[in-house]
Amino acid sequence: MRRFATPLLIGYVLGVLALTIPPDFSPDPTDYLGESAWTPLQLVPFAVDAPSFLLNVVMFVPFGVLLPVCVPRVGSFWRVLACSVAASLSIETAQLIINLTLDGLRTVDVNDLVANAVGGVLGFGLLRLARPGPPSRP
């Protein structure tokens, strides 16, 4: 199974990076003048619209499924959670650097971190349901 999961994980990671890392430049600079809807930093937990939160959860479900298949030593709840948080934090940090250097109009959001972690552990839960076995040790 790992033989098929590894290319899927690589493609998945490349897709997530393509969606989250490139600067989001507005085609019209006046879009962000005056009353701006863009917030560069969102540090208030759970102050987010439900669709955005849900999409971030869904985006990380494959991570929680594929990572433990490709890297068996990551096959515990706590390790998948830690890897999900680390991956999400890496994305948010890259977005912050892009904002500071390129004016990339990306929002660095603590809610994305929470949603991505939830998605990762949900994916791991789905994997455990699909492949029952003895619980992994942390």
Kindly give the residue locations of the regions a language model identified.
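Bulky hydrophobic segments
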Residues: M1-L105, F124-P138
